[in-house]
Amino acid sequence: MTEKLVLVTGACGEIGQALVQGLAQKGGYRIVTADLSPLPNTITSVSAEHVQGDLVYQIKTFYDHDFDLIFHLAASLSSKAEVLSEDAHRINVEGTMQLLMLAAYRSEKYQKSVKFLFPSSIAVYGLESVEEK
């Protein structure tokens, strides 16, 4: 059985770490991780490669990979995004668009689909007012 090549962005977050560990335990995946932070010890051994830095500026790194799946978990959280809206737009919108373009490019080049999973939580809607925090 051939291993599927997987990219997990936001790999150092709570959900990202659990996903990386789950994929590793299941087997059959070669996992490439990406995050602003260095990998925690809990997942260092199961990541075939870690790309550290801002996703928008690291996107070219991923064009050399033939990903089967992309789990896009990287995001600027709502509380930070309210204060640093330009950074949030770069991370949440431009980063997502660049990954979608990567998936489309790879699909076209290799004539195979790249599964793109973009989960979210209720936090994307934000709170109605700052006082609710």
Which functions belong to the PLM regions below?
Residues 9, 34, 70-76, 116-122:
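SDR active-site strand-loop-helix element
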Residues 44, 80-87, 127-132:
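Conserved catalytic-core motifs of eukaryotic protein kinase domains, centered on the activation segment
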Residues 6-26:
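N-terminal Rossmann NAD(P)H-binding glycine-rich loop of SDR-like oxidoreductase domains
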Residues 44-57:
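Rossmann-fold cofactor-recognition segment
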Residues 97-133:
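Conserved Rossmann-fold NAD(P)-dependent oxidoreductase catalytic core, especially the SDR/UDP-sugar
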Residues 69, 95-98:
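Conserved cofactor-binding/catalytic machinery of classical short-chain dehydrogenase/reductase
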Residues 55-91:
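NAD(P)H-binding glycine-rich loop region in Rossmannoid oxidoreductase-like domains
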Residues 28-40:
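Conserved glycine-rich Rossmann-like NAD(P)H-binding loop of the short-chain dehydrogenase/reductase
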